[in-house]
């Protein structure tokens, strides 16, 4: 009679662990896919960061892209608002990155002039 009580508990624990492992695999797979999508834009980010004199902020820019769009769509930096005053006007990822990096460079320069930290600029 004791065995019957332990078996459902073991089954429930096994199912819980199995679902947890499956969830972790899906989470890590999606995260890897997002990372790869963002890193596909790295060469354009490096080019624009060097052009705007903020090449030391490459990782920050890539992090912003990951946060804003996961590297998807035509406006990975969500920067059409700063260029055109409205969302969805950017049709090319390179244009979005150029505008976003330029705006970030201006914000960093302004933050340094005002004596505030980097995160205020971001």
Q: What spans do the regions from the language model cover?
A:
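Catalytic glycan-binding domains that act on GlcNAc-containing polysaccharides
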Residues: 32-122
